[in-house]
């Protein structure tokens, strides 16, 4: 079962809060409202993950737009799987994940990202952290209208 972790939903909410801040401190942008409904249910039912099947369409669209703003791959161009390692020392993905990455769906990619981030032992998190794409400055959010 492919599932979205609550931390990704939080990150998507914060992404939209930066891009579409509340004009009055109360009103939420449609993307935030859609994601917040899912988040609230997860908190209420003490769930860490939401099944991707049946995810509300507006929340899914908002989540996908956030996902598109994240680095696609954890690769830092030091792939030890090409030398026979089962797990890449550079990014922390398994040989199979490296091979199948282009065809994986966003939810499965985010699950892999979560696993390697929690593990935190690959070189992208220490020795070669400067190579990590998420450490680079991205475009500024649009100003509120």
Give residue ranges: language-model regions.
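N-terminal acidic leader/helix
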Residues: 2-26, 73-80
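Amphipathic alpha-helical interface segments used for dimerization/assembly
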Residues: 9-13, 17, 35-36, 40-44, ...
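Short, charge-rich amphipathic interface segments used for partner binding and complex assembly
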Residues: 29-67
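Short, charged low-complexity linear segments at domain edges
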Residues: 64-83, 141-144
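Local cysteine-cluster metal-coordination motifs and their immediate loop/turn environment
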Residues: 76-97
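Short cysteine/histidine-rich metal-coordination sites, predominantly Zn2+-binding motifs
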Residues: 93, 103-113
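Short Fe-S-cluster ligation motifs
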Residues: 112-138
């Amino acid at each position: 079962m492919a599932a979205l972790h609550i931390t990704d939903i939080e990150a998507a909410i914060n992404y939209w809060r930066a891009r579409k801040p509340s004009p009055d401190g109360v009103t939420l942008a449609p993307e935030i409202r859609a994601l917040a409904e899912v988040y609230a249910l997860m908190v209420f039912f003490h769930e860490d993950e939401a099944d991707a099947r049946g995810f509300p369409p507006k929340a899914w669209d908002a989540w996908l737009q956030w996902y598109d703003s994240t680095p696609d791959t954890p690769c830092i161009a030091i792939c030890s799987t090409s030398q026979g390692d089962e797990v890449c020392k550079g990014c922390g993905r398994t040989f199979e994940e490296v091979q199948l990455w282009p065809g994986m769906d966003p939810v499965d990619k985010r699950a892999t990202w979560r696993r390697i981030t929690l593990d935190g032992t690959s070189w992208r998190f220490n020795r070669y952290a400067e190579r990590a794409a998420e450490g680079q400055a991205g475009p500024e959010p649009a100003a509120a209208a």
